[in-house]
Every structure is written in structure tokens, then in C-alpha cells.
């Protein structure tokens, strides 16, 4: 018997944090396989560039802070207006900083929680009713291995990612009987603008050992393509050079 993966042609996927790194790579891979993408990030100019590259028939963008519930609802309404449905939600937007818990400003703490956790919650809340109505869909939350065991210099960031882990566990139990699958993708260090902005440089030895955005994006697409009878919940990803 040949194992058949699902065809994702025409599937509509909402992706936050879509102008670089994992989000951008996921959008590109999905469109290559016939998917449609609804992209969100703060930088409108970069979003417009990506939509132009992917094609206006395949992509649409909503610029803004996904931690704002008004923006989250605009993402959902734009998806429905452009493509008529929502099949998958990929909350991927994330920011982080390294340092002692005492080093962060109040604003930095609040921004990490707003983007990493509240943004995840608001986008899911805005898009989920469409999937519940048709009793089918995927929520694929991009968290981090830091959500299971944060390093000594990333306590606040790790806390936001642990919040995503807890959210995913609760949603899995709430939604599996309603046809909506919930998966958690937890990569180790990945070569993204976020990693570079957190104190590393493009030539640093640490980045040479990191995952690539396409590695993580491939897992997102793989989860979508699993038969509807299969529910996979937690994926942790490491490069072969990284220490687990």
C-alpha cells in the first residue's frame, strides 16, 4: 500500500512574521506546492515585495502588529475576502533578546509577550471560527526548544515560548474532536534575522551550526500534508551539529 500525503494545492494558510526567516520560507514552499498565503508582519514594504514575488493570485498581505486584536481580525477578514476560507494558521511572529532578567526594560518584556504569545492567541481567535464551521483545519504554532528548557540568558523569551507550549496543549485537547489539528514546531537555533539581531553576526561560528529557515518550513508543510486521520502534536528540530 502506498502512503499518500495530502495535496495542499489551493489550501489557504495564514502566516505571521512572514517577511523573513521561517515565515518567508514557509510562504515560498507553500506557494510552490499550489497553496495560497495570507501574510502578516509589521513592515509593509517588505510584505509588498514578497507578494509581488509570489504573485497576487497566490498571496495577500496585512501589515501590522499581530498582537493587536484589531489587526488579527483584519488578517482573518482579508483572508476570507481574498480566498474565501482559511485552512491553516501558522503563528510564527516572534522577537527575543538575551540577557539577565534584570537587564530588560519594561517595554522589552511587554513586547516579547505581546508578539510571541498574545499575537499567537489573537490570530488563532480571529481565524479559528472559519475552520470550526467546516470541521477541518490546522493550527501550527512555531515556538522554540526554549519553551521546554530556556537558557540562563533567555528567561523572558523562554517564558513566552513556554506559554505557547501550554496554549498548544490546551488547544489540542479542546479542538481535536472538532476536526482541527494543533501542532507545535519547536526549532533549536535557526539562522534568521531574529538570531542575528539577538547578538550574533552573519559570520559567527554559532550560526554555522544552526538550522536553516527552509528546514523548519519543510516541517510546517509536512504537517499540513499528513492524512487527516493523523494528529502529530510536538515536533522538535535540531541540526546535526547542535547539542541537544
Please describe what each predicted stretch is.
Residues 180, 184-185, 204-243:
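C-terminal helical subdomain
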Residues 19-20:
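Conserved glycine-rich cofactor-binding loop
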Residues 100-101, 108-110:
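Substrate-binding pocket helix/loop in short-chain dehydrogenase/reductase
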Residues 44, 63-75, 106:
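The beta1-alpha1 cofactor-binding region of Rossmann-like NAD(H)/NADP(H)-dependent oxidoreductases
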